[in-house]
């Protein structure tokens, strides 16, 4: 087996024009809007509500939501760029964005029924903050360690949990 250096010279991993534009836009936001309030928010455990209001003006809160629900989907590289630029300046804001996009919006878009999609996705695309909660006695927030299960009751009217919730 012989490896060719031609392959190395011909492979280019460059950002597209759209990806570069998103990087510059998010970098400008992160460097301008987030720094003045980071220490105060962190010290006082205050969520970045005002900063989020400014962030949604860019329309990036809907990147995991299909267009028919008001979103503006981007590729995975763009999503990574947004997270990278936010986390460079304010990791907690980046986590808030990740939860909104990945754990909330994307989960509903992929696994929600039509009623859930119509109810939640337009609101999330418009800027309402998405959230996610997971806790179990003995497992905390470690999803892999969860043992609690929900089973539909025999009459189909409710679910029965077989463990403890915190």
Residue ranges and their predicted role:
Residues 95-115, 140-142, 155:
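N-terminal glycine-rich flavin-associated loop
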Residues 33-34, 111, 128:
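A generic secondary-structure signal for well-formed alpha-helical elements
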Residues 71-72, 115-166:
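Glycine-rich, Trp-frequent "lid" loop and neighboring beta-strands that shape
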